Protein backbone atom coordinates (compact mmCIF):
# COMPACT_ATOMS: atom_id res chain seq x y z
CA UNK A 1 0.00 0.00 0.00
CA UNK A 2 1.39 3.42 -0.88
CA UNK A 3 2.45 5.67 1.97
CA UNK A 4 0.89 8.70 0.35
CA UNK A 5 -2.80 8.22 0.94
CA UNK A 6 -3.26 11.96 0.60
CA UNK A 7 -3.32 14.36 -2.31
CA UNK A 8 -2.32 18.01 -2.70
CA UNK A 9 -6.03 18.88 -2.83
CA UNK A 10 -6.42 17.68 0.76
CA UNK A 11 -4.00 20.31 2.06
CA UNK A 12 -5.76 23.19 3.82
CA UNK A 13 -4.16 25.77 1.53
CA UNK A 14 -6.68 28.44 2.61
CA UNK A 15 -5.13 28.44 6.10
CA UNK A 16 -1.79 29.77 4.81
CA UNK A 17 -0.47 32.40 7.25
CA UNK A 18 2.30 34.43 5.55
CA UNK A 19 3.13 36.26 8.77
CA UNK A 20 4.28 32.90 10.21
CA UNK A 21 6.91 32.33 7.50
CA UNK A 22 10.55 33.03 8.27
CA UNK A 23 13.38 33.26 5.74
CA UNK A 24 15.38 30.28 7.04
CA UNK A 25 12.40 27.95 6.94
CA UNK A 26 11.47 29.17 3.48
CA UNK A 27 15.01 28.47 2.22
CA UNK A 28 14.92 24.97 3.73
CA UNK A 29 11.55 24.23 2.12
CA UNK A 30 12.70 25.46 -1.29
CA UNK A 31 15.73 23.17 -1.08
CA UNK A 32 13.64 20.22 0.11
CA UNK A 33 11.22 20.75 -2.77
CA UNK A 34 14.07 20.45 -5.27
CA UNK A 35 15.56 17.34 -3.67
CA UNK A 36 12.20 15.58 -3.33
CA UNK A 37 11.06 16.43 -6.85
CA UNK A 38 14.34 15.13 -8.27
CA UNK A 39 13.23 11.56 -7.48
CA UNK A 40 13.25 10.51 -11.14
CA UNK A 41 17.05 10.44 -11.12
CA UNK A 42 17.07 8.24 -8.02
CA UNK A 43 14.41 5.94 -9.51
CA UNK A 44 16.49 5.53 -12.68
CA UNK A 45 19.66 4.79 -10.71
CA UNK A 46 17.96 2.37 -8.31
CA UNK A 47 16.23 0.71 -11.26
CA UNK A 48 19.68 -0.27 -12.54
CA UNK A 49 20.79 -1.49 -9.12
CA UNK A 50 17.70 -3.71 -8.81
CA UNK A 51 17.34 -4.63 -12.49
CA UNK A 52 16.62 -8.29 -11.70
CA UNK A 53 14.18 -7.67 -8.85
CA UNK A 54 10.69 -6.79 -10.08
CA UNK A 55 9.26 -6.45 -6.55
CA UNK A 56 11.86 -3.93 -5.41
CA UNK A 57 11.66 -2.06 -8.73
CA UNK A 58 7.88 -1.68 -8.30
CA UNK A 59 8.37 -0.42 -4.74
CA UNK A 60 10.98 2.05 -5.96
CA UNK A 61 8.62 3.33 -8.67
CA UNK A 62 5.90 3.94 -6.05
CA UNK A 63 8.43 5.58 -3.74
CA UNK A 64 9.52 7.87 -6.57
CA UNK A 65 5.95 8.96 -7.28
CA UNK A 66 5.48 9.81 -3.60
CA UNK A 67 8.75 11.74 -3.47
CA UNK A 68 7.76 13.76 -6.54
CA UNK A 69 4.44 14.59 -4.88
CA UNK A 70 6.33 15.80 -1.81
CA UNK A 71 8.39 18.07 -4.06
CA UNK A 72 5.32 19.43 -5.82
CA UNK A 73 3.53 20.22 -2.55
CA UNK A 74 6.59 21.80 -0.95
CA UNK A 75 7.16 23.90 -4.08
CA UNK A 76 3.54 25.05 -4.03
CA UNK A 77 3.91 26.12 -0.39
CA UNK A 78 7.19 27.92 -1.20
CA UNK A 79 5.47 29.79 -4.03
CA UNK A 80 2.73 30.90 -1.63
CA UNK A 81 5.41 32.17 0.74
CA UNK A 82 7.50 33.71 -2.05
CA UNK A 83 5.52 34.44 -5.23
CA UNK A 84 8.80 35.25 -7.01
CA UNK A 85 10.07 31.69 -6.51
CA UNK A 86 10.25 30.12 -9.97
CA UNK A 87 10.33 26.43 -9.15
CA UNK A 88 10.75 25.26 -12.75
CA UNK A 89 13.77 27.51 -13.27
CA UNK A 90 15.25 26.49 -9.92
CA UNK A 91 14.72 22.82 -10.78
CA UNK A 92 16.49 23.24 -14.12
CA UNK A 93 19.49 24.83 -12.36
CA UNK A 94 19.46 22.16 -9.67
CA UNK A 95 19.49 19.29 -12.17
CA UNK A 96 22.25 20.94 -14.19
CA UNK A 97 24.48 21.05 -11.13
CA UNK A 98 23.51 17.84 -9.35
CA UNK A 99 23.29 14.40 -10.89
CA UNK A 100 22.95 11.09 -9.11
CA UNK A 101 25.38 8.53 -10.52
CA UNK A 102 24.11 8.89 -14.11
CA UNK A 103 26.55 6.35 -15.55
CA UNK A 104 26.35 3.72 -12.80
CA UNK A 105 25.02 0.33 -13.84
CA UNK A 106 25.37 -1.22 -10.37
CA UNK A 107 25.29 0.04 -6.80
CA UNK A 108 27.99 2.57 -5.98
CA UNK A 109 27.82 1.12 -2.46
CA UNK A 110 28.99 -2.32 -3.54
CA UNK A 111 25.77 -4.32 -3.51
CA UNK A 112 21.98 -4.03 -3.52
CA UNK A 113 21.88 -4.58 0.25
CA UNK A 114 24.44 -1.81 0.69
CA UNK A 115 22.27 0.49 -1.37
CA UNK A 116 19.29 -0.33 0.83
CA UNK A 117 21.26 0.44 4.00
CA UNK A 118 22.07 3.86 2.54
CA UNK A 119 18.41 4.43 1.65
CA UNK A 120 17.33 3.53 5.19
CA UNK A 121 19.73 6.10 6.62
CA UNK A 122 18.49 8.78 4.23
CA UNK A 123 14.80 8.05 4.87
CA UNK A 124 15.36 8.09 8.64
CA UNK A 125 17.09 11.46 8.34
CA UNK A 126 14.41 12.95 6.12
CA UNK A 127 11.63 11.81 8.43
CA UNK A 128 13.46 13.52 11.30
CA UNK A 129 13.89 16.67 9.18
CA UNK A 130 10.17 16.86 8.44
CA UNK A 131 9.23 16.18 12.07
CA UNK A 132 11.51 19.05 13.09
CA UNK A 133 10.03 21.27 10.39
CA UNK A 134 6.51 20.40 11.54
CA UNK A 135 7.32 21.04 15.19
CA UNK A 136 9.34 24.19 14.51
CA UNK A 137 6.92 26.18 12.40
CA UNK A 138 3.88 28.15 13.39
CA UNK A 139 2.64 28.26 9.80
CA UNK A 140 -0.37 25.90 9.75
CA UNK A 141 -0.16 24.76 6.13
CA UNK A 142 3.53 23.91 6.39
CA UNK A 143 2.85 22.13 9.67
CA UNK A 144 0.24 19.97 7.92
CA UNK A 145 2.47 19.28 4.91
CA UNK A 146 5.51 18.43 7.03
CA UNK A 147 3.46 16.03 9.14
CA UNK A 148 2.16 14.21 6.08
CA UNK A 149 5.58 14.03 4.46
CA UNK A 150 7.22 12.85 7.71
CA UNK A 151 4.70 10.01 7.89
CA UNK A 152 5.49 9.03 4.31
CA UNK A 153 9.23 9.13 4.99
CA UNK A 154 8.82 6.78 7.98
CA UNK A 155 6.93 4.42 5.66
CA UNK A 156 9.73 4.70 3.10
CA UNK A 157 12.27 3.75 5.77
CA UNK A 158 10.26 0.60 6.47
CA UNK A 159 9.91 -0.14 2.75
CA UNK A 160 13.68 -0.03 2.25
CA UNK A 161 14.32 -1.96 5.49
CA UNK A 162 12.02 -4.76 4.31
CA UNK A 163 13.80 -4.79 0.94
CA UNK A 164 17.14 -4.91 2.77
CA UNK A 165 16.02 -8.02 4.63
CA UNK A 166 15.19 -9.67 1.30
CA UNK A 167 18.71 -8.92 -0.01
CA UNK A 168 20.87 -9.20 3.12
CA UNK A 169 21.49 -12.94 3.02
CA UNK A 170 22.71 -12.87 -0.58
CA UNK A 171 24.98 -9.86 -0.09
CA UNK A 172 26.43 -10.78 3.33
CA UNK A 173 27.77 -7.39 4.34
CA UNK A 174 29.60 -7.57 7.66
CA UNK A 175 29.07 -5.16 10.52
CA UNK A 176 32.04 -3.00 9.54
CA UNK A 177 30.74 -2.74 5.97
CA UNK A 178 27.23 -1.84 7.12
CA UNK A 179 28.61 0.84 9.43
CA UNK A 180 30.83 2.26 6.67
CA UNK A 181 27.84 2.54 4.32
CA UNK A 182 25.59 4.05 6.99
CA UNK A 183 28.18 6.59 8.12
CA UNK A 184 28.82 7.49 4.49
CA UNK A 185 25.21 8.65 4.21
CA UNK A 186 25.12 10.71 7.41
Where are these regions (language model features)?
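Non-heme di-metal
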Residues: 1-186
Amino acid sequence: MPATAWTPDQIDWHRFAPEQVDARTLAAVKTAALVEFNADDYVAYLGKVFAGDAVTRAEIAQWGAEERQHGEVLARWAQLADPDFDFDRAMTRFRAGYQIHPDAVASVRGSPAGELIARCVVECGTSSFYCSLRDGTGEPVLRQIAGLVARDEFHHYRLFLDAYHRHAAADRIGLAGRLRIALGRV
